[in-house]
UniProtKB/Swiss-Prot annotation:
Pfam families: Methyltransf_9. Carboxy-S-adenosyl-L-methionine binds at K91, W105, K110, G130, I181, E182, M196, Y200, R315. This is tRNA U34 carboxymethyltransferase. The gene is cmoB. GO terms for biological process: tRNA wobble uridine modification. Its EC number is 2.5.1.-.
Length: 328
């Protein structure tokens, strides 16, 4: 099964060492009691992937691995078949020895919108909440992060991350743990915490903001990306049963309301740094994610609305800081 031993060793002598009081037993219980019905199938594909170390690795402009001399066509076909066993791939894209994983989301576009507005990630300890396949973790490593830790309870995403890691020379600068943020103690250890595409899935969004704050060091930075609507600080959309065909969407505030929420939770220096309508070029069906995507979730006669009649998805990026003096 998944071995978290390297992660335990890495955090044993740093600001996350106190996490070892609870984390190993949590993950041991998960492996014994909570595995998804398809986990063994996914893990089997992961085990059969070759361990490759790229001669060229680009994590700054993409997640791209190459080897000189190139791998054989047979090897490439075998890798692609195993990676396709881990579909659907939602966050990416990845280019691994000529296998191009064309994911549902152009997560690189989101990264381009976020990166200019945040503190440099060099030598920072980072938490990415709801990290999915871990695409952004690798981009954080590319920016010089000391370590990028992702959490996501979806076990398929863990297998996708470990598959990519295996093809990147078993790179130990990034890690994914199959946990939700509510399962984390108040670590107060991360220099930067990301929560992107999570807040609207939370029944209690203010509790989520408090949970994020509790993971930050004094003066640490929160990067929050979520759905928003137009309006003043009093405007919040509470959708009915579905929003853009998603059942689990609870609160979509205006950017102004979200700013107020962050301030109410004790964050300071709150900034709205980007607001962007999600397009069908950024989120779409591909041959690596073959089910419905954004185009099917919008009103075919008026793409400014969802099929339910709500405003179409608009996403904002906010940056805020936990009070205190930041000490790198």
């Amino acid at each position: 099964m998944i071995d978290f031993g390297n992660f335990y060793q890495q955090i044993a002598k740093g600001p996350l060492s106190h996490w070892l009081n609870t984390l190993p037993s949590q993950l041991s219980s998960w492996q014994q009691e909570s595995l998804h019905g398809k986990f063994k199938l996914w893990f089997n594909s992961l085990e059969h992937l070759p361990s490759l170390t790229p001669t060229t690795l680009d994590l700054n402009d993409s997640v791209t691995a190459r080897m000189e001399p190139d791998i054989s066509e047979g090897q490439r076909e075998g890798i692609e078949k195993l990676l396709r066993n881990l579909m659907p791939w939602r966050k990416g894209p990845f280019s691994l020895y000529g296998v191009d994983i064309n994911t549902e989301w152009r997560s690189d576009w989101k990264w381009q919108r976020v990166l200019p507005h945040i503190s440099p990630l060099k030598n920072r300890l980072i938490l990415d909440v709801g990290c999915g396949s871990g695409y952004h973790l690798w981009r954080m490593v590319g920016e010089g992060a000391m370590m990028a830790v992702g959490i996501d309870p979806m076990q398929l995403f863990l297998c996708q991350f470990e598959a990519v890691r295996k093809l990147l020379g078993d790179d130990q600068r990034a890690h994914v743990l199959p946990l939700g943020i509510e399962q984390l103690p108040e670590l107060a250890a991360f220099d930067t915490v990301f929560s992107m595409g999570v807040l609207y899935h939370r029944r209690s969004p203010l509790d989520h903001l408090w949970q994020l704050k509790n993971q930050l060091v004094a003066g640490g930075e929160l990067v929050l990306e979520t759905l928003v609507i137009e309006g003043d600080e009093n405007q919040v959309l509470v959708p009915g049963e579905r929003y853009a065909q998603m059942r689990n969407v609870y609160f979509i505030p205006s950017a102004a309301a979200l700013t107020t929420w962050l301030e109410k939770c004790g964050f300071v220096d709150v900034r709205v740094v980007d607001v962007c309508t999600t397009t069908t070029q950024e989120q779409r069906r591909t041959d690596w994610m073959i089910t419905e995507s954004l185009a099917e979730f919008l009103d075919p006669e008026d793409p400014s609305k969802t099929v339910e009649g709500y405003p179409a998805p608009v996403r904002a990026v906010l940056v805020a800081r936990k009070p205190g003096i930041y000490q790198p």
